[in-house]
A protein has these predicted regions:
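Conserved ATP/PPi-binding loop(s) of AMP-dependent carboxylate-activating enzymes
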Residues: 280, 291-326, 364
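Conserved AMP-binding/adenylation subdomain of ANL enzymes
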Residues: 16, 130-150, 154-197, 212
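Conserved structural elements of the adenylate-forming
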Residues: 87-94, 103, 122-143, 157-158, ...
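Single conserved hydrophobic/aromatic residue that forms the stacking wall/gate
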Residues: 1-7, 11
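AMP-binding/adenylate-forming catalytic core of the ANL superfamily
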Residues: 26-36, 43-48, 199, 305, ...
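Gly/Ser/Thr-rich phosphate-binding loop
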Residues: 169, 196-201, 210-270, 282, ...
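Conserved pre-ATP/AMP-binding loop-to-beta segment of ANL
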Residues: 70, 76, 86-111, 118, ...
Length: 464
């Protein structure tokens, strides 16, 4: 299922079909893998971009696609949604008997980025939308009389977090603005022009915004602003609040879940903290030996399911029982993310378990180092990763994107290192500072530390 805005999603929900949302940026090889892995037999897409052409190319090798439907245009070999829909009854007959829809039936499947293999297929059931009520009501705090604006490509789970299910359940008006290239100034203009009341975007968006003259825009309609997708640097939290008076409410979750941790209504955010567990999830921190951590002890974020899976938690990785068992066993779902509780019950993000750097016997999370670098006024964004080191095993590398046309010089390197040596322990000091024009990101805006690390480690192997 492909649609820039997913207006046909409500039809799909009513008839009980299983959907696989996808971005319109996919190419032939992407479709081939997704068709085969998901046993796809029908596709619905808009005329945006080269989607239909790439699908036709993929169908040269994949022969099980029975139905191809295009919305808003026509193409040889495709059925026209606009032409054919008028022939169907406007009265909906709910499926019954063996075709009846049950809450535990598969409903929607997401291809979620793989770190060591092809994307996994995260499968949710028809109770999944109910899990997003907390997301919209108590985190986004959507107003039934207001307008909610969330930035996310509709091919990703975050779009259902921020644009559809929870917001519908809360009777919110959803603002949709399609763009091919992100322009923070245009987003701010939209907020001002249409009097947006609640806004959600990845941290990358706010990192760009804080370097703009925000006082040139009337943002007085905004009642609540939220962010998720990756950890929010405290420096961005403080700068955004200083410039707008608005408090960024950070949240955490995965494609496999709904909002799991967040700064919810009634809580007082701590800059840099993800917030507290949401009521529907029993969140714990687990140590490598399988015991539960105490306050200030770093470990993996896990969700206890001994009393059953909460609404919003996925069913399985479709077609891969081994991956499902690896992630969900002994009464816990293992997120693969590391964090710790403080004494007040707030959670602080450390990194992905595979992002943690092991240097000279120390376990080092990248986020703390990134936060210190982000405090410098000339830094737009950064990523901390590991590189091979013959003595330490792994050394620390910081890849830095500079703001406002600043040039990366040896003098600037010295200035950054001087700041780091003043503010963080010596075992966390980067060995390498690399200035780069941009960082690799996923389509949804997350920094791909994994890609930076793999390139460096592969380069080291080639040089040996």
């Amino acid at each position: 299922l492909l649609s820039r805005r997913q207006r046909q999603m409500c039809i799909r929900d009513r008839i009980g079909a299983v959907a696989i949302p996808a971005t319109n940026l996919l190419l032939k090889s992407d479709f081939e893998y997704r068709f085969k892995a998901g046993n796809v037999d029908a596709i619905l897409c808009t005329a945006d971009g080269p989607v239909s052409r790439e699908v036709d190319k993929a169908c040269r090798s994949y022969k099980n696609l029975k139905v191809k439907i295009m919305v808003g245009a026509s193409r040889k070999g495709w059925r026209s949604f606009n032409k054919e829909v008028k022939y169907f009854s406007s009265h909906f007959r709910r499926p019954h008997g063996e075709n009846a829809i049950h809450g535990d039936d598969p409903s929607i499947m997401f291809f979620t980025s793989g770190t060591t293999s092809y994307p996994k297929i995260t499968t949710h059931n028809f109770k999944y939308p109910l899990g997003h009520y907390v997301t919209a009501k108590y985190w986004h705090q959507v107003d039934p009389d207001g307008i909610h604006f969330a930035i996310s490509d509709t091919g990703w789970g975050k779009a259902l977090w921020g644009k559809i299910y929870g917001q519908w359940l809360c009777e919110a008006c959803i603002f949709t603005y399609d763009f091919d290239n992100f322009d923070a100034k245009e987003i701010l203009h939209m907020i001002e022009k249409y009097k947006i009341t609640t806004f959600c975007a990845p941290p990358t968006v706010y990192r760009v915004m804080v370097h703009l003259k925000l006082d040139q825009y009337d943002l007085s309609s905004l009642q609540n602003v939220t962010t998720a997708g990756e950890a929010l640097n405290p420096e961005i939290f403080e700068k955004f609040k200083a410039k707008t008076g608005l408090t960024l409410m950070e949240g955490f979750g995965q494609t496999e879940t709904t909002l799991t941790i967040g700064n919810l209504v009634g809580t007082t955010p701590k800059p840099g903290s993800m917030g507290v567990p949401t009521p529907q999830y029993d969140v714990q921190i687990m140590l490598p030996d399988g015991t539960l951590a105490g306050p200030e002890e770093e470990g993996e974020i896990v969700i206890c399911t001994e009393d059953g899976a909460p609404n919003g938690l996925f069913m399985e990785y479709y077609g891969d029982e081994e991956k499902t068992q690896n992630a969900w066993h002994d009464g816990y779902y293992h997120t693969g993310d590391t964090a710790y509780f403080d004494e007040d019950g707030y959670l602080w993000y450390v990194g992905r378990t595979d992002d943690v750097i092991k240097s000279s016997g120390y376990r080092i999370g990248p986020f703390e180092i990134e936060n210190e670098i982000m405090k410098l006024p000339y830094v737009l964004e950064c990523a901390v990763t590991s590189v091979p080191d013959p003595i330490r095993g792994q050394a620390i590398k910081a890849s830095i994107v500079l703001a406002n046309g600043e040039e990366g010089t040896d003098k600037l390197r010295s200035e950054i290192m001087k700041s780091l040596k003043k503010n963080i322990a010596s075992y966390k000091w980067p060995k390498i500072l690399d200035f780069t024009k941009e960082l690799p990101k996923t389509i949804s805006g997350k920094i791909r530390r994994k890609e930076i690390k793999e390139n460096d480690w592969n380069e080291n192997e080639d040089n040996e």
